[in-house]
């Protein structure tokens, strides 16, 4: 492609509202342009990268017998109502009405649509297993779109769905898809980790996220420093530890604590450590009130609470609800003397606490010497807190460390979550109707593009891995008024194209400095500069990743480039 004939609108300055490095560079290098908040156009270079990523995905899907199809982005409300998610998905689902008043949603995901299709078309176990996938735009009304393509309101996604007659078959496809995703992200040049994750609004169980490591990532990964264990911090398990010898229980004592509400204030007022305080939180799980307890220096993990209670929606009670249920205000709530109808769920660490401080369910008062086993009723103990750096790894090997990650893919075992709700059944060998077992597997195509940029850049611009680069070679003719340079550059351009290379030829009437700056910013793997030694048949070759440059005779250039490409391929 001749650069004079395409659209690559590079910028010299960093856009003021671009926070993430990938957002800055994709704007500056002319890959994307914002249309409105969270919505972007993919310019020609970005579109080529998107197609490269999609090609990798398609190749890996074909290896595991997944079949591509395409479903509508516009989905009728009735299908979502069948699954129940129309009422629980939340404001992220973009809803609209047509001129007849019928309700629709713009597809945030396609479980309902694919389940309805397979339900109507597949009736026998003989047609299973079946894996179908698509690549298309998705829509989510993000409250705060940010970081460019990393969190947008419209984005490109590959989503696959598998249907099975046995758990063993689902396990096999799940493992195949896990390996396929590993292959995809490896081929894209990403430094990533598969981590144990929560299924969230998707439902189901057994899920892994694929996290591209990056400081701009919005997810925290908890990993062992001595094993392969890795989990999203929401799902990292904290094992119950032996409390050891318990201290002698002291007499419960009510203490006047005027205007002392926070754990830090209570600890300072009583002259104790936050770890000697019980943090009490009144929460609502699908409208049902529960009291959740953690140690004062720990943070409650609402995902663990939600999963324990098998709730669709979990939220903190309002100040008015706290007053109605406990008779006090937030900051003075506690487990002692609470209405027996309110179930108490306490983190394992609370079980090991002796003579702790806790709210007295009375404004401006706390209890000292609280011992849960003696002083509270109707208590269930479970793992309810976020893991912390320095905690033992759940697999018993090493210590937990944290890293930030960008979620680029996720695989789920949905089980019968959707098939039962939507009556998607098949007839088994005995002619009995059985609900299909399902799996769901997603890759953020546009997010993967941004993740690649986050990991592959320097202060001059992008550095594209070979397999996803928009073009293999960048040929620069420094002076388009010099016949020798133009003729040699044209000759090389045609020869490399004829030999299967994807080439960008900078034939613009621009200064050499502009061409070099744009070339570094765009970041193609290999640059061939036709300059002052063109009349001698000598060109300069520069490797973008390493910065190495070589002067090569034009008649030796093809073999030299072949070797460089092989070298880049082996080190990608």
Curated annotation (Swiss-Prot):
It holds the Pfam family tRNA-synt_2b. GO terms for biological process: prolyl-tRNA aminoacylation. It is an enzyme of class 6 (ligase). Keywords: Aminoacyl-tRNA synthetase, ATP-binding, Cytoplasm, Ligase, Nucleotide-binding, Protein biosynthesis. It is found in: Cytoplasm. Its EC number is 6.1.1.15. PROSITE patterns: AA_TRNA_LIGASE_II. Gene3D superfamilies: Anticodon-binding domain, Bira Bifunctional Protein, Domain 2. It comes from the Bacteria. It catalyses: tRNA(Pro) + L-proline + ATP = L-prolyl-tRNA(Pro) + AMP + diphosphate. GO terms for cellular component: cytosol. One of its GO terms (molecular function) is ATP binding. HAMAP family: Pro_tRNA_synth_type1 (MF_01569). Homodimer. Belongs to the class-II aminoacyl-tRNA synthetase family. ProS type 1 subfamily. Consists of three domains: the N-terminal catalytic domain, the editing domain and the C-terminal anticodon-binding domain. Catalyzes the attachment of proline to tRNA(Pro) in a two-step reaction: proline is first activated by ATP to form Pro-AMP and then transferred to the acceptor end of tRNA(Pro). As ProRS can inadvertently accommodate and process non-cognate amino acids such as alanine and cysteine, to avoid such errors it has two additional distinct editing activities against alanine. One activity is designated as 'pretransfer' editing and involves the tRNA(Pro)-independent hydrolysis of activated Ala-AMP. This is Proline--tRNA ligase. It comes from Bacillus licheniformis (strain ATCC 14580 / DSM 13 / JCM 2505 / CCUG 7422 / NBRC 12200 / NCIMB 9375 / NCTC 10341 / NRRL NRS-1264 / Gibson 46).
């Amino acid at each position: 492609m001749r650069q004079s004939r395409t659209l690559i609108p590079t910028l010299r300055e960093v856009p003021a509202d671009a926070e993430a490095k990938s957002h800055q560079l994709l704007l500056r290098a002319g890959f994307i342009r914002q249309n409105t908040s969270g919505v972007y156009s993919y310019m020609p270079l970005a579109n080529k990268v998107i197609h490269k990523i999609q090609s990798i995905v398609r190749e890996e899907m074909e290896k595991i017998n997944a079949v591509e199809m395409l479903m509508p982005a516009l989905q009728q409300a009735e299908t979502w109502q069948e699954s129940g998610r129309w009422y629980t998905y939340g404001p992220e689902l973009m809803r609209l009405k047509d001129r007849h008043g019928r309700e629709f949603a713009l597809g945030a995901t396609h479980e309902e649509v694919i389940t309805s299709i397979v339900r109507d078309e597949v009736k026998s176990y003989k047609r299973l297993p079946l894996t179908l996938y698509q690549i298309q735009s998705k829509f989510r009304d993000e409250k705060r779109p940010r970081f460019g393509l990393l969190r947008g309101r419209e984005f490109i996604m590959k989503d696959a769905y598998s249907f099975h007659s046995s758990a063993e078959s689902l396990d096999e496809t799940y493992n195949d898809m896990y390996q396929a995703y590993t292959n995809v992200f490896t081929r894209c040049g990403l430094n990533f980790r598969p981590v144990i994750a929560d299924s969230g609004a998707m439902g189901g169980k057994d899920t892994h996220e694929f996290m591209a490591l990056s400081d701009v990532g919005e997810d925290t990964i908890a990993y062992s420093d001595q094993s392969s264990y890795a989990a999203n911090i929401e799902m990292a398990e904290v094992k119950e530890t032996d409390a050891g010898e318990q201290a002698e229980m002291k007499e419960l004592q009510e203490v006047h604590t005027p205007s002392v509400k926070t754990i830090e204030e209570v600890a300072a007022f009583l002259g104790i450590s936050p770890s000697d305080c019980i943090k009490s939180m009144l929460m609502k799980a699908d409208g049902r009130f529960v009291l959740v307890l953690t140690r004062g220096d720990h943070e409650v993990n609402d995902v663990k609470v939600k999963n324990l209670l098998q709730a669709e929606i979990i939220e903190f009670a309002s100040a008015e609800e706290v007053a109605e249920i406990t008779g006090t205000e937030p900051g003075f709530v506690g487990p002692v003397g609470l209405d027996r109808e309110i179930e108490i769920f306490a983190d394992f660490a609370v079980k090991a606490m002796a003579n702790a401080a806790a709210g007295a369910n009375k404004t401006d008062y706390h209890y000292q010497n609280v011992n849960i086993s003696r002083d509270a009723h109707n208590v269930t103990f479970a793992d309810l807190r976020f893991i912390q750096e320095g905690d033992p790894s759940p697999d018993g090997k090493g210590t937990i460390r944290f890293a930030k990650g960008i979620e680029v893919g996720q695989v789920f075992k949905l089980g019968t979550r959707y098939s039962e709700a939507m009556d998607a059944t098949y007839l088994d060998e005995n002619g009995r109707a059985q609900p299909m077992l399902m799996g769901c597997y997603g890759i953020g195509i546009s997010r993967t593009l941004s993740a690649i940029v986050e990991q592959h850049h320097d202060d001059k611009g992008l550095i594209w891995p070979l397999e996803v680069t928009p073009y293999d070679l960048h040929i620069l003719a420094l002076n388009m008024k010099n016949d020798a340079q133009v003729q040699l550059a044209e000759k090389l351009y045609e020869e490399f194209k004829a030999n299967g290379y994807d080439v960008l030829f900078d034939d613009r009437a621009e200064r050499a400095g502009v061409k070099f700056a744009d070339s570094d910013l765009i970041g193609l793997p290999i640059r061939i500069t036709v300059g002052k030694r063109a009349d001698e048949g000598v060109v300069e070759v520069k490797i973008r990743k390493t910065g190495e440059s070589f002067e090569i005779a034009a008649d030796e250039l093809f073999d030299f480039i072949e070797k460089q490409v092989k070298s880049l391929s082996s080190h990608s």
